[in-house]
Amino acid sequence: MARYIGPKCKLARREGTDLFLKSGVRAIESKCNIEAAPGIHGQRRGRQSDYGTQLREKQKVRRIYGVLERQFSGYYKEAAGKKGATGENLLQLLECRLDNVVYRMGFGSTRAESRQLVSHKSISVNGQTVNVPSYQVRAGDVVAVREKAKNQLRIVQALDLCAQRGRVEWVEVDTEKKSGVFKNVPARSDLSADINESLIVELYSK
């Protein structure tokens, strides 16, 4: 399945919420009418079955983190095999992706831009170049922008934007050095309350 490259607003309208696919320079409401579904009948959102609700939640989370269907299924299987709550394990695996950590540290204005930085070998982990967006970052790992990319305007702008919106507590960043530490894997209480991971567990448990 190919990665979606179409209008970001369409995805946000489909899920009826901000998926954080845009930089956040302007409020999402000023760009997308997220209250209305896409299409000619977008003003009307029909009633959903339990399955439909579960599927929409899975699609929402998958799109937030920019993960393809097969990857997402793999993460779920890995999460189910771990000790603890499967839903929480799933979200933690997604949060530990290198592209997501780069985004959380503020080196990219969106997860898509952060994924591109990783793919273009602009990011290092513990001093070693890593170009795999799905690489799992561990507590204590040092994630940094490589010297060759430090002066990129988009990275400077992304850091400014992150300073405005605030940085999550589980990363510590030196903006001058463009380097950060992934202090710990976030607990469920640290993550978005707008995600109902139990619906995803119910979907995969069918």
Curated annotation (Swiss-Prot):
A GO molecular function held by the record: rRNA binding
Keywords attached to this entry: Ribonucleoprotein, Ribosomal protein, RNA-binding, rRNA-binding
Domain of life: Bacteria
Any Gene Ontology biological process: ribosomal small subunit biogenesis
Membrane-spanning intervals of the chain: none
SUPFAM superfamilies: Alpha-L RNA-binding motif
Stretch forming the signal peptide: none
GO cellular component: small ribosomal subunit
Gene3D superfamilies in the cross-refs: Ribosomal Protein S4 Delta 41, Chain A, domain 1, RNA-binding S4 domain
HAMAP family: Ribosomal_uS4_B
Family: Belongs to the universal ribosomal protein uS4 family.
Subunit description: Part of the 30S ribosomal subunit. Contacts protein S5. The interaction surface between S4 and S5 is involved in control of translational fidelity.
Job of this protein: One of the primary rRNA binding proteins, it binds directly to 16S rRNA where it nucleates assembly of the body of the 30S subunit.
Entry protein name: Small ribosomal subunit protein uS4
Organism whose genome encodes this protein: Pseudomonas fluorescens (strain SBW25)
Gene: rpsD
